């Protein structure tokens, strides 16, 4: 890779991101701009996948809101994400937890890991 591109991407990487894996429950604090105002919106759910490497790395969080499953994908190093908190470490044996889309209620629970 071009050294100039490497230098630019290295400056864009965030260092305040906690380590998390698919199956972990996270709370994402997202900066939302509405007109001239900016506020923080929380999105709390289970990480169902991580994808990519470096600046372009993303993760998808799934939650159930009013009985409807909502998935939202965030860039890992985005300045729009104010804070990322890991609330629980889950124990799963897959990298992509797409099977959770078909499960409801207690069947969609994930065991807690001892980390």
Curated annotation (Swiss-Prot):
GO annotation, biological process: translation
Gene Ontology CC terms: cytosolic large ribosomal subunit
Keywords, comma-separated and alphabetical: Ribonucleoprotein, Ribosomal protein
Coiled coil: none
MF terms in GO: structural constituent of ribosome
The keyword Transmembrane helix belongs to this UniProt entry's keyword annotation: no
UniProt cross-references to InterPro entries, sorted A to Z: Ribosomal_bL19, Ribosomal_bL19_CS, Ribosomal_bL19_sf, Translation_prot_SH3-like_sf
Record flagged with keyword Ribosomal protein: yes
Role summary: This protein is located at the 30S-50S ribosomal subunit interface and may play a role in the structure and function of the aminoacyl-tRNA binding site.
Family: Belongs to the bacterial ribosomal protein bL19 family.
Protein name: Large ribosomal subunit protein bL19
Organism (species): Latilactobacillus sakei subsp. sakei (strain 23K) (Lactobacillus sakei subsp. sakei)
Species lineage: Bacteria, Bacillati, Bacillota, Bacilli, Lactobacillales
Gene name of this polypeptide: rplS
